[in-house]
Amino acid sequence: MINSSFILLASTVTSKKVGRITQIIGPVMDVAFPSGNMPNIYNALVVKGKNAAGQDIDVTCEVQQLLGDNKVRAVAMSATDGLMRGMDVIDTGSALSVPVGEVTLGRIFNVLGEPVDNMGPVNATVTSPIHRSAPAFTQLDTKLSIFETGIKVVDLLAPYRRGGKIGLFGGAGVGKTVLIMELINNIAKAHGGVSVFGGVGERTREGNDLYMEMKESKVINEENLGESKVALVYGQMNEPPGARMRVGLTALTMAEYFRDVNKQDVLLFIDNIFRFVQAGSEVSALLGRMPSAVGYQPTLSTEMGGLQERITSTKEGSITSIQAVYVPADDLTDPAPATTFAHLDATTVLSRGLAAKGIYPAVDPLDSTSTMLQPWIVGEEHYETAQGVKKTLQRYKELQDIIAILGLDELSEEDRLLVARARKIERFLSQPFFVAEVFTGSPGKYVSLVETIKGFQMILSGDLDSLPEQAFYLVGNIDEATAKAATLQVENS
């Protein structure tokens, strides 16, 4: 049975309410409707007609304010070029609705749910409004469980919560996209789940690069779209603020269908959550609201909460969200990142230093955090191993200045041993990715949490002190490291 909030497309035609444009200010317009025919807040309005040059116009807007005198103020989801006062505006009678279900996999959509990949129309039988309430408290799954990703450094040191929200921090060129693609690949293989990628206010070139890389690594299967593991929703930097403000909700709505109807585990990527806030700030100013701290919208917390509260685990399935967070001027106290942090369960920080060393994924083991890393959630064994790894790496970090000035020989025997183990740990935190096989030539590895814990315990206990550190670089589990060490020994002898 289909959830009541997902609507089967039918050919019923209702009488439309028609209004007229009275004022246009950039992406915002005022529309007058006949008395008694006012649209509701969040209703979608459509402007169709011809501009002065005789070209067709088709602009969708969303009602934001009821102004009195039978007027509403609406925000456009596409450019308002060519619109004129007096043009007819049709009230669709409902909120923006977008296609949902398997037909969305392997395709790219805009904020309105229209395909923009030149691969023909989407034959959707079910659509859903983008404005929906969060699941009721009675539907929520309150059990704290780890979402295993198969990536050693994440699962051991900053584990993700099933149905949680993770912040992904990292500059350009440190491997954000590859990490995202590997997570999409692993959730499909290990959890039978799908992913939805929401490109919110980022560069068009990056969206195109991601699409091409997904096709190359078979995350999107062009020959058989049904086998694709991801749906893409883009609202790029050059689009009006209305589109950038709502594209996150479009992606979330598609993810909710997979969770609520298909009962799947879903990964929702939002790149970048800051742009969602930024677009809201632009719209707020255009609507004439009084700005709050640092010029942000007064409704910042409400808007963020409305999006984030819909991302959760229910008894049917889960949406686990990974959100790239841009920090303006590296100021963590800025209202936009500060409001985002309140919702995050874990942070994955990518380090340029590790990327420069060739250690991929370049996840910083000391800066990345998770609320799930508690002994009563993950178990004593996991917790103790993770703390041991962090302690060893922290001590190695402290000793690096001494090593740089005086050299390794000046360290005590105990510290030399610790440095050797730390370097093995650092290399063992790297692993070959499935989606990078085409570039590296080495097959990808999915490492279970049990194998991960066992491997790091053996390094910490000193069982593998005799093995060379290069044996631990870009391998899966610890057995591969010992096999690689044996191969290296044969080659060197």
Swiss-Prot record:
Gene3D superfamilies according to UniProt: 2.40.10.170, Bovine Mitochondrial F1-atpase, Atp Synthase Beta Chain, Chain D, domain 3, P-loop containing nucleotide triphosphate hydrolases
UniProt binding sites for ATP: 170-177
GO cellular component: chloroplast thylakoid membrane; mitochondrion; proton-transporting ATP synthase complex
Highest taxon of the lineage: Eukaryota
Localization annotation: Plastid, Chloroplast thylakoid membrane
Regions annotated as coiled coil: none
SMART domains according to UniProt: AAA
Keywords: ATP synthesis, ATP-binding, CF(1), Chloroplast, Hydrogen ion transport, Ion transport, Membrane, Nucleotide-binding, Plastid, Thylakoid, Translocase, Transport
Biological process annotations from GO: proton motive force-driven mitochondrial ATP synthesis
GO molecular function, one term: ATP hydrolysis activity
Membrane topology recorded in Swiss-Prot or TrEMBL: Peripheral membrane protein
Catalytic activity: ATP + H2O + 4 H(+)(in) = ADP + phosphate + 5 H(+)(out)
EC number(s) on file: 7.1.2.2
InterPro entries per the UniProt record, alphabetical: AAA+_ATPase, ATP-synt_VA_C, ATP_synth_F1_bsu, ATPase_a/bsu_AS, ATPase_alpha/beta_chains, ATPase_F1/V1/A1_a/bsu_N, ATPase_F1/V1/A1_a/bsu_N_sf, ATPase_F1/V1/A1_a/bsu_nucl-bd
CDD domains named in the record: ATP-synt_F1_beta_C, ATP-synt_F1_beta_N, F1-ATPase_beta_CD
Quaternary context: F-type ATPases have 2 components, CF(1) - the catalytic core - and CF(0) - the membrane proton channel. CF(1) has five subunits: alpha(3), beta(3), gamma(1), delta(1), epsilon(1). CF(0) has four main subunits: a(1), b(1), b'(1) and c(9-12).
UniProt-listed HAMAP family: ATP_synth_beta_bact
Family listed: Belongs to the ATPase alpha/beta chains family.
Record function comment: Produces ATP from ADP in the presence of a proton gradient across the membrane. The catalytic sites are hosted primarily by the beta subunits.
NCBIfam families: atpD
Name the UniProt record assigns to this protein: ATP synthase subunit beta, chloroplastic
Organism in which the protein naturally occurs: Chaetosphaeridium globosum
Lineage of origin: Eukaryota, Viridiplantae, Streptophyta, Coleochaetophyceae, Coleochaetales
